[in-house]
């Protein structure tokens, strides 16, 4: 859904704020936010109500000023959920949507626009579905603000591949060392 109405974009930003607060509280507590393996020690209800000391990220407070916001959804009635019966959080059902979103961002960049993939609106999915008239079988996958950046980012800093890619097994040799 391409959201052009500033008041709807503002409402989407408002829906993100409690999740942003919880995310910040979990980071401040030294946790991996929204981890499905290790339970949080953060009082979630209090964190959602309380602004962090660092303040809210301005992106969500000013979504109404962004030229366009995309809300990407996945129709769960048509995706293959091959991991639906596993005893863990499902990952496969909407996995193919993120390459689509990435391609949208690449196309936008080629036209001089910038954007970001965020999933911080997902916990408010029911309100988003009502706000945008999404069908009941759809799940919200991403919120993507798009606009003209003040400056285009260039080279990003990333970990070296050999720090996280191994050969043959998770505990195998780093990719570079194994190929020498």
Model-found features: residue ranges?
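Generic alpha-helical structural context detector
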Residues: 13-17, 106, 142-145
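Generic beta-strand structural signal
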Residues: 66-69, 111, 140-142
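Glycine/small-residue-rich phosphate/adenosyl-binding loop
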Residues: 1-96
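Small-aliphatic-rich amphipathic alpha-helix that forms the alpha element of a beta-alpha
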Residues: 70-131
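C-terminal helix-cap and adjacent tail motif
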Residues: 36-39, 139-180
């Amino acid at each position: 859904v391409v959201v052009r109405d500033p008041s709807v974009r503002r409402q989407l930003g408002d829906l993100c704020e409690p999740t942003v607060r919880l995310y910040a509280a979990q980071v401040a507590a030294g946790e991996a936010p929204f981890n499905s393996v290790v339970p949080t020690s953060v009082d979630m209800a209090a964190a959602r109500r309380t602004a962090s000391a660092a303040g809210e990220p301005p992106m969500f407070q000013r979504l109404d000023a962004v030229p366009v916001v995309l809300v990407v959804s996945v129709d769960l009635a048509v995706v293959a959920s091959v991991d639906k019966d596993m005893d863990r959080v499902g990952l496969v059902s909407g996995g193919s949507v993120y390459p689509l979103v990435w391609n949208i961002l690449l196309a936008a960049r080629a036209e001089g626009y910038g954007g970001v993939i965020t999933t911080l609106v997902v916990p408010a999915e029911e309100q988003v579905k009502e706000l945008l008239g999404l069908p009941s079988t759809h799940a919200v996958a991403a919120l993507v603000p798009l606009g003209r950046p003040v400056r285009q980012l260039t080279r990003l800093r990333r970990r070296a591949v050999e720090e996280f890619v191994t050969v043959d097994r998770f505990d195998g040799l780093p990719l570079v060392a194994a190929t020498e």
